[in-house]
Amino acid sequence: MILHAIVPDAATAGWAAGNGASVVQLRLKDVPTAVRVRVGREVIASVGDLAMIVMNDDVAAAEALGVTVHLGQGDPGVERATRAGIRFGRSAGTPEEARRAEAEGALYIGAGAVWATPSKTDTGPAIGLDGLRAICRAVSIPVVAIGGVDASNAADCVAAGARGVAVIRAITELPRLRALLEIAVADSGDGRER
């Protein structure tokens, strides 16, 4: 099960990792790479071995830090990440985008936005649970649901086939989300680590 917390700083990253996040993604918009590297070092120190660390959008920062990078559909860098041996995740809003990301070598898919959300306004229309289900069926790599996900609907995402959820606004619900997702995975009955 993947509980993916998208954070703005090291303090939030450390709290998230200590409260059940298995992945911590540093998302700093409109700042230079040098700032991302500096804050990324703080995140690494704060998180330690508690969670996988992901840098949002910046391949150069990910390379400098030795962490995974997450790339949206419009973000450049897949070729550079591949050449440098950097693991990467990809955003996808359709099964076709997900299949393309898997073919590129993506480690995971961030699928959504599942529901409309004010946290990320540069996405297409919400894909809903049917769209999430279609993406999950289209690929063999893990799919993480993002966009409007919180404690009230995270289990529905797992039931649709997601291996986990990503949260921004619902980060304060991490302990409850972890418990709910563990129940949802147990109820799925397939025995796979999600």
Please place each PLM-identified region on the residue numbering.
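Conserved N-terminal beta1-alpha1 strand-loop-helix module at the mouth
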Residues: 1-75, 80-108, 130, 134, ...
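A short acidic, helix-capping loop that chelates divalent metal ions and anchors anionic groups
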Residues: 26, 62, 115-121
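Short acidic/polar capping segments at secondary-structure boundaries
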Residues: 114-116, 149-151
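Active-site-adjacent loop and "lid" segments of alpha/beta metabolic enzymes
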Residues: 121-126, 145
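Conserved catalytic/dimer-interface elements of ABC ATPase nucleotide-binding domains
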Residues: 166
